[in-house]
Curated annotation (Swiss-Prot):
Annotated ranges, domain RRM: 56-134, 136-218, 231-303
Organism: Mus musculus
Single Gene Ontology BP annotation: chromosomal 5-methylcytosine DNA demethylation pathway
Disruption phenotype: Mice display embryonic lethality at E3.5 due to failure of embryos to implant.
Record region (Required for nuclear localization): 360-409
Keyword Ligase (UniProt): no
Molecular function via GO: enzyme-substrate adaptor activity; RNA binding; single-stranded RNA binding
Gene: A1cf
Task performed by this protein: Essential component of the apolipoprotein B mRNA editing enzyme complex which is responsible for the postranscriptional editing of a CAA codon for Gln to a UAA codon for stop in APOB mRNA. Binds to APOB mRNA and is probably responsible for docking the catalytic subunit, APOBEC1, to the mRNA to allow it to deaminate its target cytosine. The complex also seems to protect the edited APOB mRNA from nonsense-mediated decay.
Pfam families with a match to the protein in the record: DND1_DSRM (PF14709), RRM_1 (PF00076)
PROSITE patterns per record: RRM
Subcellular locations according to the entry: Nucleus; Endoplasmic reticulum; Cytoplasm
Protein name: APOBEC1 complementation factor
């Protein structure tokens, strides 16, 4: 069997062989090609210390395919001592468009990023350079929401090796449950990579559930000088019912009048202080404290440089994605530090850091223009239904981009033209049970979340969706969800589940329609109305013929329904807030794409 390791010194028969041999002779470094990469140094001659610490490696992307070490090494040598360079190679002898360079210390790596990013290596060819991070953390989706951290940790240790920790976040709606996913940290990148390979879809199930695994987004590192000026706190794990006034009162209790303003989004908030000392004091005093029945986590918000919007990642070069044209943001923003591992970055622009960019969106309901580029979604997006970047991590296939979909009234990144259409459920159609894991959700819909919240308020249990499919008259595969509500099903098993009268060509549309049909059947409006009780109550004999309501059911007012219906609309309203740009609308989903 042919080895991936080239014989000899790795230079025989290569392009620019003479120039490369001259480089090796001048520097004394080794140059060996193996496993699709050409390694220069690592360690360099005379190196008798330990390898450089984490943070000393940079990623260089957008390389001309016929550029090699004889041009790249002299450029990097001007900045600092090179410990190692790894140039990714194709079988045809060209490079793959990117390389990794490890310097002897962090400061040299930082200088290299500043000096080499957008450096014109050849006429009209600009390099893309950013920090490189060895990722040791995996995203695992498909975890039952009832499982606790200790159970997940124990289970992951059974099926993979090298597990160090598990990070689990509570549901925004129910703090006793998790969000349906977890982040598993391993002792090394190699251990994480081996675990990811072992956990490929279909190989292993957890608690009888199929799972999806992908690399987690690495935390954005901000230099100490920048962090030393931050006076905004990020507060997470709040109750949905916790108000901005309550948060402001709690943080002002440390020092009255210290808080300038508070902005709460779902279950997290940003607290602005007039000076940094007060912010740090409040963080130390309130981190871990129980507020409104939930222990909160308080950290400093992380300012992110504009270069964080254009990520160059390990993997096939040239697929990095950026916001262009009307959707560029030339100024610095602030980064939500925990959505690093929750799927969608949340940025905002406090006046202390930047002015508000001029935003323009289409005037009519529809798609964004192709100024905003996109890539194929990862399994995290399929499970969480929000875009997830994975920048600067090992082996992620160049998948860096800024998440900004979910803009309220139907704004999505432009893709294939899609026509919303429902199909009649005709006699003789055969409905076949299906599994949703292998199907890609198309967008975030609101009706399923409304139904879930109504069921929670009335103690009916979690709605159960069962996917079926049928072949239409035009030979298209059509989908239909049957919906079962546990409490009602136990009372009326003969007429359950709820079956909508139409099928859809899209899975997410079928789920939305099934939820809407269920709400309509229950007599619950999905849009606002006058004051009064519209949801089932204990004083109502039935919500519709044949369905009795449990006597312990709590009343749900129109105002509460309207609040549930407008969760997504509230997100869109943040575009008008003085310091929140539109792309902050992609706040995290509670589980698999539900807000």
């Amino acid at each position: 069997m042919e080895s991936n390791h080239k014989s000899g010194d790795g230079l025989s028969g290569t392009q620019k062989e003479a120039a490369l041999r001259a480089l090796v002779q001048r520097t004394g470094y080794s140059l060996v090609q193996e496993n699709g990469q050409r390694k220069y140094g690592g360690p360099p001659p005379g190196w008798d210390s330990t390898p450089p610490e984490r943070g000393c490696e940079i990623f260089i992307g957008k390389l001309p395919r016929d550029l090699f070490e004889d041009e790249l090494i002299p450029l990097c040598e001007k900045i600092g001592k090179i410990y190692e360079m790894r140039l990714m190679m194709d079988f045809n002898g060209n490079n793959r468009g990117y390389a990794f360079v490890t310097f002897s210390n962090k400061q040299e790596a930082k200088n290299a990023i500043k000096q080499l990013n957008n450096y014109e290596i050849r006429t009209g060819r600009l390099l893309g350079v950013c920090a490189s991070v060895d990722n040791c953390r995996l995203f695992v989706g498909g975890i039952p929401k009832t499982k606790k951290r200790e159970e997940i940790l124990s289970e992951m240790k059974k099926v993979t090796e090298g597990v160090v920790d598990v990070i689990v976040y509570p549901s925004a709606a129910d703090k006793t449950k998790n969000r349906g996913f977890a982040f598993v940290e391993y002792e090394s990148h190699r251990a994480a990579a081996m675990a990811r390979r072992r956990l490929l879809p279909g190989r292993i199930q957890l608690w009888g559930h199929p799972i999806a695994v992908d690399w987690a987004e690495p935390e954005v590192e901000v230099d100490e000088d920048t962090m030393s000026s931050v006076k905004i706190l990020y507060v997470r794990n709040l109750m949905l019912s916790t108000s901005e006034e309550m948060i402001e009162k709690e943080f002002n209790s440390i020092k009255p009048g210290a808080v300038e303003r508070v902005k709460k989004i779902r279950d997290y908030a940003f607290v602005h202080f007039s000076n940094r000392e007060d912010a740090v004091e409040a963080m130390k005093a309130l981190n871990g404290k129980v507020l409104d029945g939930s222990p909160i986590e308080v950290t400093l918000a992380k300012p992110v440089d504009k270069d964080s919007y254009v990520r160059y990642t390990r993997g096939t070069g040239g697929r990095n994605t950026m916001l262009q044209g009307e959707y560029t943001y030339p100024l610095s923003h602030v980064y939500d530090p925990t959505t690093t591992y929750l799927g969608a970055p949340v940025f905002y622009t406090p006046q202390a850091y930047a002015a508000i960019p001029s935003l323009h969106f289409p005037a009519t309901k529809g798609h964004l223009s192709n100024r905003a580029l996109i890539r194929t979604p990862s399994v995290r997006e399929i499970y969480m239904n929000v875009p997830v970047g994975a920048a600067g991590v090992r082996g992620l296939g160049g998948r860096g981009y800024l998440a900004y979909t979910g803009l309220g009234r139907g704004y999505h990144v432009k893709g294939d033209k899609r026509e919303d259409k429902l199909y009649d459920l005709l006699p003789g159609m055969e409905l076949t049970p299906m599994n949703t894991v292998s199907l890609k959700p198309q967008g975030i819909k609101l009706a399923p979340q409304i139904l879930e919240e109504i069921c929670q308020k009335n103690n009916w249990g979690q709605p159960v969706y069962q996917l079926h499919s049928a072949i239409g008259q035009d030979q298209r595969q059509l989908f239909l969800y049957k919906v079962t509500i546990p409490a009602l099903a136990s009372q009326n098993p003969a007429i359950h589940p709820f079956i909508p009268p139409k099928l859809s060509a899209y899975v997410d549309e079928a789920k939305r329609y099934a939820a809407e049909h269920t709400l309509q059947t229950l007599g619950i409006p999905t849009e606002g109305g006058d004051a009064g009780t519209t949801a089932p109550t204990a004083t109502s004999a039935t919500v519709f013929p044949g369905y009795a309501v449990p006597s312990a059911t709590a009343p749900v007012s129109t105002a509460q329904l309207k609040q549930a219906v407008t969760l997504g609309q509230d997100l869109a309203a943040y575009t008008t807030y003085e310091v929140y740009p539109t792309f902050a609308l992609t706040t995290r989903g509670d589980a698999y794409g539900t807000f």
